[in-house]
């Protein structure tokens, strides 16, 4: 088999004899290409850097007079806008992880925002408020007029007014305690009588009542408030509007009345005449005349006539009471 001519040529070929063979020039060419690319990038950056100073110089000139607070305020406004837009986006998009919020969750979030801290700028003058607190001056609109002793002592009209007020208070208290309420239930001539009247404390009836009660005036406590019924539901039947059966009472009203009659105090003719006489004295207004007649020593005949008339009046009252009892 004849030898392959191509293989022979490869074996006989020497790369060093080739005119294009330059192993030292390859890294130089690669470095040249990288240098060209770096120069292009540096050129672009330098153009960008050179074009920026115009805008930067304008911004610096615009904010030359600013003290720095304006920038802080602008930053705060930007943050608030971001939080507001973020909250709107969260409400529209949903919760975390893309979950859809229900109406209840949104309502709860709105309620929480109502009680959230207020980040708005403060409008109150803190320095003026602090100075006012230190000076301890009264807040306008809360004046309290306190009467001083010097004014009351120097002004005679104030003394008169004070004395008049004290006199009025004493008369009011006297009027309140000068009246007494008489309430009694007694059994006379087979009938139960109930009386309730308001009379003067120094009247004959009041004195007789206090004497019968053992000089102990009745203590009237505060009236008890009636118990309120619970509100009726719209679904409950109206039982109260239904007619009640009278035959189911079984004479309870009569029993209660009989119990009161048993508890009533029984009066004889003398006690009833004494009560009627006290009422007559108060009605005719002869209390002072009786007091004068009792103190005088020279009117023996007048006293005898007066006692005779009184006895006749008592007999007439007792006779009428007996006739009323028989009927």
Curated annotation (Swiss-Prot):
How is this protein annotated for GO cellular component?
Swr1 complex
Q: Which UniProt keywords apply?
A: Activator, Chromatin regulator, Nucleus, Transcription, Transcription regulation
Q: Does this entry carry the keyword GTP-binding?
A: no
The BCNT-C domain extends over 247-327
Function text: Component of the SWR1 complex which mediates the ATP-dependent exchange of histone H2A for the H2A variant HZT1 leading to transcriptional regulation of selected genes by chromatin remodeling. Involved in chromosome stability.
PANTHER family xref list: CRANIOFACIAL DEVELOPMENT PROTEIN 1 (PTHR48407:SF1)
Subunit description: Component of the SWR1 chromatin remodeling complex.
This chain belongs to which protein, by name? SWR1-complex protein 5
Please tell me the species this chain comes from: Gibberella zeae (strain ATCC MYA-4620 / CBS 123657 / FGSC 9075 / NRRL 31084 / PH-1) (Wheat head blight fungus)
């Amino acid at each position: 088999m004849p030898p392959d001519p191509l293989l022979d040529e490869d074996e006989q070929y020497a790369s060093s004899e080739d005119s294009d063979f330059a192993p030292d020039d390859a890294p130089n060419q690669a470095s040249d290409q990288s240098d060209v690319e770096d120069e292009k990038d540096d050129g672009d950056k330098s153009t960008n850097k050179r074009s920026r100073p115009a805008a930067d110089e304008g911004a610096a000139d615009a904010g030359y007079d600013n003290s720095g607070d304006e920038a802080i305020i602008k930053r705060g406004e930007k943050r608030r806008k971001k939080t507001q837009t973020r909250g709107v986006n969260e409400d529209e998009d949903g919760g975390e992880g893309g979950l859809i919020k229900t109406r209840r969750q949104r309502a709860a979030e709105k309620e929480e925002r109502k009680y959230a801290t207020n980040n708005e700028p403060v409008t109150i003058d803190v320095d003026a408020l602090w100075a006012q607190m230190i000076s301890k001056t009264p807040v306008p609109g809360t004046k309290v007029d306190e009467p001083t002793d010097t004014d009351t002592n120097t002004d005679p009209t104030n003394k008169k007014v004070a004395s008049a007020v004290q006199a009025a208070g004493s008369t009011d208290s006297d009027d309140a305690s000068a009246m007494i309420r008489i309430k009694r239930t007694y059994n006379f001539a087979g009938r139960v009588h109930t009386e309730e009247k308001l009379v003067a404390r120094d009247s004959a009836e009041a004195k007789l009542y206090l004497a019968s009660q053992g000089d102990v005036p009745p203590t009237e406590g505060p009236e008890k408030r009636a118990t309120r019924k619970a509100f009726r539901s719209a679904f409950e039947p109206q039982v109260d509007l239904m007619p009640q059966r009278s035959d189911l009472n079984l004479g309870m009203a009569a029993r209660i009345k009989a119990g009161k009659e048993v508890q009533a105090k029984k009066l004889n003719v003398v006690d009833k005449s004494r009560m009627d006489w006290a009422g007559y004295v108060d009605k005719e207004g002869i209390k002072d005349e009786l007091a004068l007649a009792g103190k005088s020593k020279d009117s023996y005949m007048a006293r005898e006539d007066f006692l005779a008339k009184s006895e006749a009046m008592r007999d007439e009252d007792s006779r009428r009471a007996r006739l009323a009892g028989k009927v």
